[in-house]
């Protein structure tokens, strides 16, 4: 993912991932950590 996408979308996705459990949360974290 581009840096801009990471900086803007990933904080939102990570906050959502905290509410989610399982594979979806893991997938978001993996994509945002790259």
From Swiss-Prot:
<keyword id="KW-0872">Ion channel impairing toxin</keyword>
<dbReference type="GO" id="GO:0005246">
    <property type="term" value="F:calcium channel regulator activity"/>
</dbReference>
<comment type="subunit">
    <text>Heterodimer of an A and a B chain; disulfide-linked.</text>
</comment>
<keyword id="KW-0108">Calcium channel impairing toxin</keyword>
<dbReference type="GO" id="GO:0016020">
    <property type="term" value="C:membrane"/>
</dbReference>
<keyword id="KW-1052">Target cell membrane</keyword>
<protein>
    <recommendedName>
        <fullName>Omega/M-ectatotoxin-Et1a subunit B</fullName>
    </recommendedName>
</protein>
<dbReference type="GO" id="GO:0090729">
    <property type="term" value="F:toxin activity"/>
</dbReference>
<feature type="disulfide bond">
    <location>
        <begin position="10"/>
        <end position="32"/>
    </location>
</feature>
<keyword id="KW-1218">Voltage-gated calcium channel impairing toxin</keyword>
<dbReference type="InterPro" id="IPR036261">
    <property type="entry name" value="Ectatomin_sf"/>
</dbReference>
<keyword id="KW-0407">Ion channel</keyword>
<keyword id="KW-1053">Target membrane</keyword>
<dbReference type="Pfam" id="PF06457">
    <property type="entry name" value="Ectatomin"/>
</dbReference>
<dbReference type="GO" id="GO:0044218">
    <property type="term" value="C:other organism cell membrane"/>
</dbReference>
<keyword id="KW-0472">Membrane</keyword>
<dbReference type="InterPro" id="IPR009458">
    <property type="entry name" value="Ectatomin"/>
</dbReference>
<comment type="similarity">
    <text>Belongs to the ectatomin family. Ectatomin-Et subfamily.</text>
</comment>
<dbReference type="GO" id="GO:0005216">
    <property type="term" value="F:monoatomic ion channel activity"/>
</dbReference>
<keyword id="KW-0406">Ion transport</keyword>
<comment type="function">
    <text>Algogenic for animals, human and insects. At high concentrations (0.5-1 uM), it acts as a pore-forming protein that forms nonselective cation channels both in cell and artificial membranes. It is weakly selective for cation over anions channel conductance is identical in both directions. At lower concentrations (1-10 nM), this heterodimer inhibits cardiac L-type calcium currents in isolated rat cardiac ventricular myocytes.</text>
</comment>
<keyword id="KW-0813">Transport</keyword>
<keyword id="KW-0964">Secreted</keyword>
<keyword id="KW-1015">Disulfide bond</keyword>
<keyword id="KW-0800">Toxin</keyword>
<dbReference type="GO" id="GO:0005576">
    <property type="term" value="C:extracellular region"/>
</dbReference>
């Amino acid at each position: 993912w581009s840096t801009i996408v990471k900086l803007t979308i990933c904080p939102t996705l990570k906050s959502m991932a905290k509410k989610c459990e399982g594979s979806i949360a893991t997938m978001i974290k993996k994509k945002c950590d790259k």
